[in-house]
Amino acid sequence: MWTVYAKELLELLRDRKTFVFTVLLPILAMPLIFGSLGYLSSFMFRNAQQAELTYAIFGKQHAPQLAERFAREKSLREVPLAQPEAIKAAIADERIKFALVIPPGFQDALGAHRQASIALHYNNAVALDITSKRVLAVIEQHNGALRAQALASFKLSRDQLDFALDPVRLEVRSTAGKRERIGALVGGFLPYILLMVCLMAAMYPAIDLGAGEKERGTLETLLLAPVPRGALVLAKFLVLFTVGLTSALLMVASMGLLLTLFGGALQGAMQQGVRAIGARDLAMVALMLVPTAAIFASILLALSIYAKSYKEAAGLISPLMMLIIVPIALAMLPGVELNWFWAMVPLTNVSLAMKELVKGTMDYRMFFAILLSTSVIAGVLLAWCRWWFEREQVLFRN
Amino acid sequence: MIEVTGLAKRFPMARQKERRAKRRDPREQQGWFQAVRDVSFECAPGEVLGLLGPNGAGKTTALRIVSTALRPDAGRAFIDGIDILAEPLQARRRIGFLSGTTGLYGRLSARENVEYFGRLHGMAPERLRRRCDALFEQLDMHEFAHKRADSLSSGMKQKCAIARTVIHEPSILILDEPTTGLDVMSAKIVLDFVASYKALRIPVILSTHHLHEVDKLCDRVCIVNHGASIFQGTVEQLRHLGGGGDLYDAFVHVIHHGA
């Protein structure tokens, strides 16, 4: 059996495609992709927050103080516009980002202690609504100044004013640590990537080991060697298992390394969250990967050995990819949390467990239950794969 | 020595196919295809047995049964007195099997390909090394022993496949259309190899469509049609059946009219 195992591994190592997929991709590409994506998004976000916004303002004479406040903002630049009717067109062709229209009587209303309003025109069909936030910040400053004046003219004390503004104030005290919040964010997609890498890395070798033997005409001679078929299956299974697991573990290791080296570069809360993920948690994530890799290896091998050619094998395996994504993606849905119900759903439970591990809120009884059930499933699948391999209809389908 | 008696093997048929091809072949019945119904033959040391028959006659299935890849529904087969059904692993150690579609592992070198099968046959490293050296010498393969199988010419590949077939010093050879699809030079390598093993007094079963190969190498012939062996005898006896000296006529006669 080990002869077969060693030979298959040697053959795979000589294949550059497999090498790239199993070793280079998880080690380099994944952290690189996520690193650059994270950097890019934070960069863009900062840019959008600080970028200069052009605006037009009408009815300045009705509220000179407010207009002046806007004029003082460094990152806002006024662009003169002929009349309010031109606002929509000006926003559409990006001459201005937003426009403010102050109605007549604005100042009078305020003077009479009545609420006054101004209109903000802008295009809010964007994912991150930064424009309104920035305008609101300026208005809020102005409101603050006006409140201070009102405080003086109403002759109210600070406490009385607070009561008048917000009789009941809600104090939010989060019980979640910083790590838990970061974990909820990161932990959602981490298992998705890990499991996909684990599956994808084993996919090409699987096709080679099963359908490839048929297509090259080596299967027949291999079956005639005095090696029990069970041993052949086990050897091939172990190769796929090794490849999938190695690939996923390499990714865990490379991410761990990346975090220890560059974790300091992350900002505030993110950094603390990342620091809190210890080697033990990563080890447990790795442990979770073991039976999962076995499940993937069994399914892939069974499909591959059934196929007559590379082409057919690839055709059989791609729908499997789609199918396996479903339970993994389920774990990312809001409201799907690890409980005894979800702990019984294969693959979803693995994803959820990884998420909990990253968050640092794992229920260890559940962890071992999931580990056990996943191992049992892997064992059953391996047994099925072995039975499948002994069927003449599968091996000699022509 | 190999003795095969009354082999039978059937395969389940796909349902649609069953309806479409109703009773075109007498071997189809109730969702089963009786690929081999009754095949018997034997081959003694120093003898080459030619297994003849039209495409789809059941030759390959019969040979796969004898080489233990498939289990028969009925019949028995003995290799040097070993029951292949009772002790398939023992039987496999004695069989060298080669077919026209046999491939090599492209990313392994010629030598690694051969050694891999030697190891699968449980050969000790020292014995394997000596055997490999001898075979590579005999087949003149040293030049390309360390080249990847991918990059070999078809003649080199054929030599490699032959070395792989006999690495474990089998006591019988089963060759399933070994020259099909080969060019003349590669085919000659195979035929020379058969002749050399005949000289070593090792029984050889050669399934083929090329009657000149039968003429050149075979001592006895077994003709299979519709899953049953319908003629067994020497090449001379077969030639006689055709009336003249021509093997083609004789073969066609046996297929149409029986022996």
PLM feature spans:
Chain B
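Conserved ABC ATPase signature
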Residues: R148-L152
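ABC ATPase "signature
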Residues: Q232-G233
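Conserved catalytic motifs of ABC-family nucleotide-binding domains
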Residues: E169
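Conserved ABC ATPase "signature" region
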Residues: R19-D25, E115, R119, E126-F144
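Catalytic Walker B motif of ABC-type/P-loop ATPase nucleotide-binding domains
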Residues: L173-D176
